[in-house]
């Protein structure tokens, strides 16, 4: 049992403290909401189609999309373009493509998951480019323009508003440079992609007027920039520096990971690279920049224990906080546009938890038919905690635990024009370890919130063991095929632990934290809501997906401006028997803390998943939202 003292009071004797005082808040875009992965298997149309159509991979993406609204907005998938199949050449030698597999996957991302792709212009599409080296530039321009116009013709330009477009991933590496680009042909390719984006039209035609093309930004070169042996990316920067106004890329993207798995390494590596680039090419300072692969260490499939437990979640949160600090510092990362995490992979046995993924994947080969079970890792919960941050943030603060170790504090607010805001969200992040003579850590936090009406607070914790499914699995002997009882035990440890919630009546109330007995590392999310904050809206798009016989994954969509004060969700079920008769409504999530919009329901061999489902939210004031629409599910 955790012994965290969390009091709303006044405390005279403290070992470390700060108050909100005259804190400066800055507009904070949520710049960390991208994930990515590379599909397994062959890199051709058949291989990529099979990989992205795999039910386990689709369930993996469905769970990632079931984080709180805004936690993940973009997904970057290598070789996604290979879903487009070359069909034939027309009489004038122009390629004709079959977009059916590409359309199916894009529809899945957009309509079911509400995710936007980061479309990397990389692939060979049946050999079109390798077989026509003299036509490559024209064919790339044609493919880019045709792909975008095809999507606009299907669904209108509004669907593409949040799409991102990027050049070939890490073109200097032989493993990716399937086209054998030279410095010259790579520049031709990038400029062809730029022309294709510029010529792709907005085909929405209203009132008979011919609309102007919509400008679409191009990101690149998605490079490692490791040394002089990476000429393709460096040459592109040279070109852009000479004539910035004609630079084909609008956002300079790079990859910098850690070495030993720390957030500091990721950020320092990014700072060093951008400082080097600006020293060589000072004209590029006007371009926004993005670290597409801001991961703790290279090699997603390499098994590492820290990637299984709370430590990876803490590292990801710390990475975000340190990038925010670097952005505010006015140095080489002042133009930071976004970072992305390459952790949307599907893990495999025997490394279910320890690979760089958001979810642990168990392939249950003993069932008929075989199926996949996915368990949320603490890093998944960490992304959900970050999604609750406000729209304005102070700089990161460090509060000493002892002479060598500090707690990182990031305070954010939303709403409220005349004061700090009607909504406050603060993340406290411990170090991974501290000295044996660590002073008992007391943390005094003054809310300093202009309270027009009643307010309430809620605290959630991410800590070892209690919010660590990996620990539960290890305690059970790490079975390859965890049974239903163990799977439920792991899922009960998925979410951040709800610690304490209650009302606040007094202006400048103080939060006191005594974390001396909490096992390190830990993260705490504190949210404070005014009663005047928008009430919970009805959950939308309730969806029921089959996992296996008598087991379903239930997810729904949140309204972006009404879930900041959410405490938990309730999932209700009304069974229908074989004769079509309905029982009473049952609260099937009784006893679960569900801060995120999903729930996996497995009633057991004697139960049934056939029937009706509905969901509602409960906020920190114990008020409920309207129920979602009722959805019927029938297992065939």
Swiss-Prot record:
<comment type="function">
    <text>Essential lysosomal hydrolase responsible for the degradation of glycosaminoglycans (GAG) such as heparan sulfate. Required for lysosome function and autophagy. Consequently, has an essential role in the development, maintenance and function of various cells, tissues, and organs, including the muscles and the central nervous system (CNS).</text>
</comment>
<feature type="binding site">
    <location>
        <position position="170"/>
    </location>
    <ligand>
        <name>alpha-L-iduronate</name>
    </ligand>
</feature>
<feature type="binding site">
    <location>
        <position position="356"/>
    </location>
    <ligand>
        <name>alpha-L-iduronate</name>
    </ligand>
</feature>
<feature type="glycosylation site" description="N-linked (GlcNAc...) asparagine">
    <location>
        <position position="483"/>
    </location>
</feature>
<keyword id="KW-1015">Disulfide bond</keyword>
<keyword id="KW-0325">Glycoprotein</keyword>
<feature type="binding site">
    <location>
        <position position="293"/>
    </location>
    <ligand>
        <name>alpha-L-iduronate</name>
    </ligand>
</feature>
<comment type="similarity">
    <text>Belongs to the glycosyl hydrolase 39 family.</text>
</comment>
<dbReference type="Pfam" id="PF01229">
    <property type="entry name" value="Glyco_hydro_39"/>
</dbReference>
<feature type="glycosylation site" description="N-linked (GlcNAc...) asparagine">
    <location>
        <position position="180"/>
    </location>
</feature>
<keyword id="KW-0378">Hydrolase</keyword>
<feature type="binding site">
    <location>
        <position position="43"/>
    </location>
    <ligand>
        <name>alpha-D-mannopyranose</name>
    </ligand>
</feature>
<feature type="active site" description="Proton donor">
    <location>
        <position position="170"/>
    </location>
</feature>
<feature type="binding site">
    <location>
        <position position="169"/>
    </location>
    <ligand>
        <name>alpha-L-iduronate</name>
    </ligand>
</feature>
<dbReference type="InterPro" id="IPR049167">
    <property type="entry name" value="GH39_C"/>
</dbReference>
<feature type="binding site">
    <location>
        <position position="257"/>
    </location>
    <ligand>
        <name>alpha-L-iduronate</name>
    </ligand>
</feature>
<feature type="glycosylation site" description="N-linked (GlcNAc...) asparagine">
    <location>
        <position position="453"/>
    </location>
</feature>
<feature type="disulfide bond">
    <location>
        <begin position="529"/>
        <end position="565"/>
    </location>
</feature>
<dbReference type="InterPro" id="IPR000514">
    <property type="entry name" value="Glyco_hydro_39"/>
</dbReference>
<keyword id="KW-0326">Glycosidase</keyword>
<feature type="glycosylation site" description="N-linked (GlcNAc...) asparagine">
    <location>
        <position position="622"/>
    </location>
</feature>
<feature type="signal peptide">
    <location>
        <begin position="1"/>
        <end position="16"/>
    </location>
</feature>
<feature type="binding site">
    <location>
        <position position="342"/>
    </location>
    <ligand>
        <name>alpha-L-iduronate</name>
    </ligand>
</feature>
<dbReference type="Pfam" id="PF21200">
    <property type="entry name" value="Glyco_hydro_39_C"/>
</dbReference>
<dbReference type="InterPro" id="IPR013783">
    <property type="entry name" value="Ig-like_fold"/>
</dbReference>
<dbReference type="InterPro" id="IPR051923">
    <property type="entry name" value="Glycosyl_Hydrolase_39"/>
</dbReference>
<feature type="binding site">
    <location>
        <position position="45"/>
    </location>
    <ligand>
        <name>alpha-D-mannopyranose</name>
    </ligand>
</feature>
<dbReference type="GO" id="GO:0003940">
    <property type="term" value="F:L-iduronidase activity"/>
</dbReference>
<feature type="glycosylation site" description="N-linked (GlcNAc...) asparagine">
    <location>
        <position position="268"/>
    </location>
</feature>
<feature type="glycosylation site" description="N-linked (GlcNAc...) asparagine">
    <location>
        <position position="365"/>
    </location>
</feature>
<feature type="binding site">
    <location>
        <position position="300"/>
    </location>
    <ligand>
        <name>alpha-D-mannopyranose</name>
    </ligand>
</feature>
<keyword id="KW-0732">Signal</keyword>
<keyword id="KW-0458">Lysosome</keyword>
<dbReference type="InterPro" id="IPR017853">
    <property type="entry name" value="Glycoside_hydrolase_SF"/>
</dbReference>
<protein>
    <recommendedName>
        <fullName>Alpha-L-iduronidase</fullName>
        <ecNumber>3.2.1.76</ecNumber>
    </recommendedName>
</protein>
<dbReference type="GO" id="GO:0005764">
    <property type="term" value="C:lysosome"/>
</dbReference>
<dbReference type="InterPro" id="IPR049166">
    <property type="entry name" value="GH39_cat"/>
</dbReference>
<feature type="glycosylation site" description="N-linked (GlcNAc...) asparagine">
    <location>
        <position position="448"/>
    </location>
</feature>
<feature type="binding site">
    <location>
        <position position="39"/>
    </location>
    <ligand>
        <name>alpha-D-mannopyranose</name>
    </ligand>
</feature>
<dbReference type="GO" id="GO:0005975">
    <property type="term" value="P:carbohydrate metabolic process"/>
</dbReference>
<feature type="binding site">
    <location>
        <position position="78"/>
    </location>
    <ligand>
        <name>alpha-L-iduronate</name>
    </ligand>
</feature>
<dbReference type="GO" id="GO:0030200">
    <property type="term" value="P:heparan sulfate proteoglycan catabolic process"/>
</dbReference>
């Amino acid at each position: 049992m955790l012994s965290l003292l969390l009091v709303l009071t006044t405390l005279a004797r403290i070992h470390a403290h700060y108050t909100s005082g005259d804190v400066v808040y800055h507009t904070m875009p949520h710049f960390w909401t991208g994930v990515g992965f590379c599909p397994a298997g062959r890199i051709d149309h058949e291989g990529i189609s099979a990989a992205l159509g795999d039910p386990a991979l689709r369930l993996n993406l469905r769970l990632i999309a079931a984080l709180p609204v805004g936690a993940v907005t973009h997904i970057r998938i290598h070789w996604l373009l290979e879903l487009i199949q070359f069909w034939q050449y027309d009489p004038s030698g122009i390629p004709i493509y079959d977009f059916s597999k590409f359309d199916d996957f894009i529809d899945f991302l957009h309509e079911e998951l509400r995710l936007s792709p980061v479309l990397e212009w990389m692939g060979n599409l049946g050999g079109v480019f390798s077989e026509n080296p003299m036509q490559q530039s024209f064919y790339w321009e044609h493919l880019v323009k045709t792909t975008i116009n095809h999507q606009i013709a299907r669904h209108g330009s509004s669907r593409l508003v949040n799409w991102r477009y990027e050049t070939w991933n890490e073109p200097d590496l032989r493993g990716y440079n399937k086209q054998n680009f030279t410095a010259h042909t790579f520049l031709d390719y990038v400029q062809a992609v730029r022309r294709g984006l510029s010529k792709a039209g907005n085909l929405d035609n209203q009132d008979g007027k011919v609309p102007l093309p919509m400008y679409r930004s191009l990101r690149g070169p998605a490079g490692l920039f490791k040394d002089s042996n990476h000429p393709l990316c460096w040459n592109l920067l040279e070109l852009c520096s000479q004539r910035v106004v004609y630079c084909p890329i609008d956002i300079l993207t790079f990859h910098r990971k850690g070495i030993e798995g720390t957030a500091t390494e990721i950020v320092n590596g990014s700072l060093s690279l951008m400082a080097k680039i600006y020293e060589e090419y000072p004209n590029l300072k006007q371009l926004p920049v993005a670290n597409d692969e801001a991961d703790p260490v290279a090699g997603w499939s390499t098994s590492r224990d820290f990637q299984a437990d709370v430590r990876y979640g803490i590292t990801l949160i710390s990475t975000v906080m340190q990038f925010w600090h670097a952005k505010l510092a006015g140095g080489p990362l002042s133009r930071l546009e976004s970072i992305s995490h390459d952790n949307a992979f599907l893990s495999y046995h025997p490394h279910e938890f320890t690979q760089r993924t958001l979810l642990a994947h168990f392939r249950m080969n003993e069932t008929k038919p075989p199926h996949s079970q996915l368990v949320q890792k603490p890093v998944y919960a960490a992304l959900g905690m970050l999604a609750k941050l406000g729209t304005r943030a102070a700089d990161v603060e460090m509060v000493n635990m002892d002479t060598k170790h500090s707690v990182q504090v990031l305070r954010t607010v939303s709403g409220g024009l005349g004061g700090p805001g009607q909504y406050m969200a603060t993340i406290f992040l411990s170090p991974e370890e501290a000295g044996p003579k660590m002073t008992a850590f007391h943390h005094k936090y003054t809310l300093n919130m202009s309270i027009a009406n009643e307010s309430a607070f809620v605290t959630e914790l991410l800590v070892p063991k209690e919010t660590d499914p990996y620990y539960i699995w290890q305690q059970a002997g790490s079975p390859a095929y965890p049974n239903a009882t163990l799977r439920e035990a792991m899922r009960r440890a998925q979410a951040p632990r709800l610690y304490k919630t209650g009302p606040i009546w007094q202006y400048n109330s103080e939060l006191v934290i005594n974390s001396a007995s909490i096992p390190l590392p830990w993260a705490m999310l504190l949210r404070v809501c005014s009663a005047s904050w928008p009430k919970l809206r009805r959950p939308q798009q309730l969806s029921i997906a089959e996992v296996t016989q008598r087991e379903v994954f239930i997810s729904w969509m949140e309204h972006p401006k009404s879930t900041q004060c959410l405490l938990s969700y309730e999932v209700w079920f009304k069974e229908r028997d074989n004769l079509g008769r309905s029982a009473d409504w049952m609260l099937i999530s009784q006893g679960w803390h569900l801060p995120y919009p999903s729930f996996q329901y497995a009633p057991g061999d004697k139960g049934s998943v056939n029937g009706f489902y509905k969901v509602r939210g409960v906020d920190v004031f114990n008020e409920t939202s309207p129920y979602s629409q009722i959805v019927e599910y029938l297992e065939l």
